Amino acid sequence: MEAHVKESTDTYCVIEMKIPYSGTFLNTEENIQHCLNEAGQLATSCALSQFDTDGSPIKVAKQRYTSKGLTGKYYQTPYGDFYLQRHVYQSSNGGATYCPLDHDAHIVVSSTPKFAKMVSSKYSRNASSDVQKDLSENHQRYVSRSYIQNVSQAVGEIIDSRPSWKYAIPISPTLVYFIAISLDGTCMLLCNDGGYRQAMVGSISLYASDGERLYTRYTAMPPEHGKNRFYETFIRDIKSVKKLYSQAKYIGVADGAADNWTFLKEYTQVQILDYFHACEYLTSVSNASFKNPIEGKAWLEEACHTLKHKENGAAELLNEMRTFLKKRIRDGKKETIQTAITYFENQMDRMNYESFCEKNMPIGSGVIEAACKVIIKQRMCLSGMKWTDTGAKTVLALRCLNESDTMWEQFWDKVTNIN
C-alpha cells in the first residue's frame, strides 16, 4: 500500500502517500488514482470508526441492548472496500441485532452513503453491466452486478418508505403564473410472459407569466392493473405542489384519451388538448381530401395556423372538414375524415388555442411526451430489458428523483439526517 495514516484524531486524519511515476503518463495517472483510492479507503475507515460506540449498553426504542462484542464487516466505498471491526448489539430477549455505526452513518446494505448515491444514480441511467464497467474503468472499483442492483433496490425502498417527505422547489411563488399537469403512458416489457404493457408517467411544470417553463418534476409507475398506484403517488405530488403554489392557475395538458380528462378535471382549472395531436388529425384530413399533395400541404399549413391563431378556429375547421365528406373520394378516406371530425367534436372545449396563446398558456404536451422517452423508454427499453414489478418500480423512482431538478440532492440530504 502506497498510502498510510500519519495521524488520526476525533476530528480529522492525516494521510501520507507515495505516488510512483511509471512509464507512460497514462500509467502514472492510473497510479495516482490507485493511490488516491488507497488514501480514500484509509480516510473513510478512520471517519467511519468515529460512529462506533465504546461497547457500553445502549437503549433502542426504550429497550436495553448490550454489545455482543466487536464484529467485522466489509464496507464498500467510492475508493474501495475495507474491513472494519465494530460493536453489534442485541437485547436480552434475543432477536435482531443492531449496529449503531451502520445506523448512525446511514450505511446502505454495506455501502457508505456516498457510494450508494453514486451506484444508484448510475444504475438509474444504465444497465448493471454498464455501471459495473464504468466503475471498473473510470474509478478502479470492481463490484458485482448483483451488488449494484441490491444497493439500488435498497435506495428505492427508502424512497418508497418515505412518501411523506417534502421536497422544496427552488422557484419563488411570485414567479409562478401557470402550473401544467400532464400524464401519459408508454409500453415496456415485463418478465414472466407479461408482455408489453403500459407504464405511466406524470409531470408537473411551473411556468412564468410569459410562458417560460421554470421547473418540472416527474412521477412514474410501472405497469399495473388499473392505475391506482400511479394515481395515488401523482395526486400526492400534485397536492404538495398546490400547497406551495396556491395562487397559480392549474392547467391540464394532454392528448385526447378520455381517462386523462377524467383525472385532470379534478385537479386543474383549465384543460387544453395538445395542439400537435390536433394537427396530426389535420394532417390525416389533408392526405385524405386532396389528390394534389401541393394543394394538401398548402391547406394543412393554413389549417394549422387557423387552429392556433384564429378565434373559434377549431369550429371553423370542423365545419370545413364536414364539407370534405361531400367530395367524391373513397370510403376509406371518408372514414379518416369522419374520425377527425369526431375527434374535434369531442375535444372542442379544449381547443381554444387563440385564447390560450394570448394568455401565454402552454398548449403542447411536449413535456410529458419527452418524459415518456426520458423517464421510461430511455432506460426501461434498453436492448434485452425485461422487468419485474419491483425492479421497474425501483428504477423509475430513481429516475424521477434524478430528472426532477434538485430532488436527488434533497433526497440524500434527508437520508443522511434520518434519526
Regions found by a protein language model. Give the residues of each.
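An N-terminal low-complexity regulatory-tail signal and nearby short nucleic-acid-interaction modules
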Residues: 49, 53-108
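Catalytic center-proximal scaffold of phosphoryl-transfer enzymes
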Residues: 1-45, 88-419
